[in-house]
Regions:
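Nucleotide-sugar donor phosphate/pyrophosphate-binding loop at the beta->alpha transition
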Residues: 113-115, 122-144, 154
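Alpha-helix capping/helix-boundary segments
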Residues: 47, 98-99, 158-160
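An amphipathic, basic-hydrophobic alpha-helix
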Residues: 65-105, 109, 136, 140
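A short, active-site helix/loop in glycosyltransferases that binds the activated sugar's phosphate group
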Residues: 147-168
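N-terminal subdomain of nucleotide-sugar transferases
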Residues: 1-60
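Hydrophobic residues within alpha-helices
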Residues: 25-28, 103, 159
Length: 168
């Protein structure tokens, strides 16, 4: 029997927000629990945010909440000792942006493999909401994060092709 894995899950979105990223993270955590693994979740602070899910601790980090938008978590130095103290085998980055970018850098410093999931077209959202000028910069930012990770998963052919178009 294999020893349980220790997984840090860093997510840009978590309960009480309900969306594709949150739902995917919940399924990952439920699977980790069912398989006897250990996990720690790092997520943005949010009004009504829970501090435990499936028996796993959810560590909330300061965030900016704006009406109608997801809370944006702020990377902070306290994340590194939290990750280091948990001694993970892998860091799972769920739709990485600000927190995920910081966690990927921590993983590099601590020599911890990372798994990122590309499931939010942040640049596309920017274009949709009239921030066309930010599109290319956001595309490069997200690509840079995924290029840094050990492995990237893409949940659809479209997202896979989108990543490939940026050199990932």
């Amino acid at each position: 029997m294999k020893p349980p894995l220790r997984v840090v899950v860093v997510t840009e979105s978590f309960l009480p927000q309900v969306n594709g990223v949150t739902n995917s993270v919940l399924r990952v955590l439920e699977h980790l629990r069912a398989e006897g693994h250990q996990a720690l979740v790092i997520a943005p602070e949010s009004s009504g945010g829970i501090t435990e899910y499936a028996g796993f601790r959810v560590k909330r980090v300061p965030s900016l909440e704006m009406k109608g938008l997801l809370p944006v978590g702020f990377p902070q130095k306290a994340i590194e000792p939290l990750i280091d103290g948990f001694n993970p085998d892998v860091i799972h980055l769920a739709s990485p942006f600000f927190l995920g970018n910081y966690a990927s850098r921590v993983a590099e410093r601590l020599d911890i493999p990372t798994l990122s999931v590309y499931q939010t077209d942040i640049a596309g959202f920017a274009r949709h909401y009239g921030l066309t000028v930010a599109h290319d910069s956001l595309k490069r930012w997200v690509a840079k994060i995924h290029k840094r990770t050990t492995r990237t998963l893409a949940p659809s052919n479209w997202s896979c092709e989108d990543l490939k178009s940026t050199g990932v």
